[in-house]
Amino acid sequence: MVGLAGGLTRSSAYPAREFWNEKKPSDWTADEIDLLLNKSPWAKDAAISYYGGQNGPLSSSLPGERRRSGNASSGTSPSAMSPAAWKAIIRWQSALPVREAMKAPPSPDIEKFYILNMVGDVPSVGATPDEDATQRAARFETLKQVTKLEHKGDEILLSRVEVAPKNDLSLAGTLFYFSRGLALRPEDKQAVFSTKLGPIDVKCKFTLRDMMYRGNLEL
């Protein structure tokens, strides 16, 4: 099941009883997994602002399928899309409940990085076929300058970016890697992801106290 939920408030976004703390992952239903991956403390709607400039890296493709019409293979140009069409979920891909929901295999990256996945109708930052190594490196340097994970005035800068392929549980997306060298704690209250992609600003706020899983802050 693949989903990309619309905007909801905290009171209606999460179930009254947080099933992820009440049930074993093996007992989660398909609907519960979809909720955890698309509308939960670890997966939130991004706030997207269109400013019409070109200050961030951009490729000519979209990372995921369009939900209502068209898809990444249709050749739809990002510049042809209405500003209102931009929509994305930011998912904390390295968080334990997300990995358990997706049955993700163990990875040494989990110990080293916070990994966030941007999924939805936004410009891709993936490599293009006609791009050489120098162009790819320059675009990544630009992306590093405009992408960060913030908490209490501190910034964790981008270490790496990769394309996340589509699977049975999620549309394709873009993975952003941030070093765990600056540890996040519940008392930090909030973590904010932000980036610029061509003509749009993307920002997503996570409330850390809501991201407790079986007694631990899971990021």
What is the role of each PLM region?
Residues M1-Y14:
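N-terminal export signals
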Residues Y14-L219:
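PEST-like low-complexity, intrinsically disordered acidic/proline/serine-rich tracts
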